[in-house]
Amino acid sequence: IKKLIYLKGHTFMKTHFKKIAALAVTLIMIISLSACGSKSENDADTLVYGSHDYTAINPALYEHGEINSLIFAGLTAHDKDNKLVPALAEKWEYDAATHTWKFHLRDGLKFHDGKDLTSEDVKFTLEAILDKKNNSEIVSNYQDIENITCPDKKTVVIKLSKENVAFADYMTIGILPKHLLKGKKLATAEFNQKPVGAGPYKLTSWDEGQSITLEKFDGYYAGKPHIKKIIFKIVENSDARLLQLKSGDLDMAQIEPKQAKSLKKDSKDFDIYRMNTADYRAIAYNYAGSKLFKTYPELANILSYGIDREAIIKSALLGEGQVAYSPIQKNKFNSSDIEKFAYNPDKIILHDVTLFGK
């Protein structure tokens, strides 16, 4: 018996008879979810997820998408089809002439501690990201912000220095509670181990190195989540995660492509899902410290002709990935006219003769 569960912009499959597994790869992630397995001791209302460890949880500082999106909520969100939808903000407008965004918050927004969430919290969050002392990992996304004002508790106005087509997407960032963090050093605040957000789940316990337990937040703006409790069980090793999936100690986990074959043999017990990610791997050349690249600036592109990306995907990722020609993944803004410098040994020889005369 299966039913769909909608959880913070993600649709998962819940099953009472089947375990669901997940595979994580460099460019494609295979994701799974299960409420319980036939051999599992886990409560039917509890999801146990095999997770990497955390030392701090704070969306303004660190990019921990999985747990951040459960504990915190942003002004905007992405639905199951990755389309931008209203979240804490019920609507917004953009003035192209002045590069100004105006977001209107929903009525009755609450943090997990029962305090009101207002436009001042939004302003505080963005200013915390921009504060150089905080060394935020995501500051580059918000550097176009010129000014932030709060005409009232439900309205925040953000003026940019120039057009930024991705800005509404960047506003999926989780909003921090100003009343808990004002005047404190964000990087060392106790808050990072006891986070309070406005997302669908609130943190109830953190056993360092062992597990992080979240329980549903009844005051969540989008309604009560269907799953009562989510346990992030710390299992760093992917082989160990696979074994615990099979034993029923985990309901959901990310594993590597090479482990997919063993799960396919147990296909009756596991559901496997694949999901594209923005993750990529690359070789970065040292332009600043190399006279060679200064003399021959076109050399980096020439070297790209010698990299068989398709072969790497087939051998290293067992086909679970896609070719990346830049740090930015293919999406709705993708241009098919861009020169990709795809694998072509003949072009290397041609350029060698042109550059070096041999």
Which ranges hold each PLM region?
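Structural transition elements
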Residues: I20, V323-K358
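N-terminal lobe/hinge region of extracytoplasmic solute-binding protein
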Residues: G50-A96, E127, V196
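A structural "hinge/loop" feature
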Residues: G50-N68, L88, K115, F167-L176, ...
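Gly/Pro-rich hinge or "lid" segments in bacterial periplasmic/extracellular proteins
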Residues: D79, K83, T172-P225, K229
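Aromatic- and charge-enriched surface segment that lines or borders ligand/interaction sites
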Residues: E90-N135, V157, F293, A300
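Surface-exposed binding/hinge segments that line
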Residues: E93, A97, V139-L181
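Ligand-site clamp/hinge motif
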Residues: D218-L263
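Periplasmic-binding protein-like
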Residues: F293-K332, D352
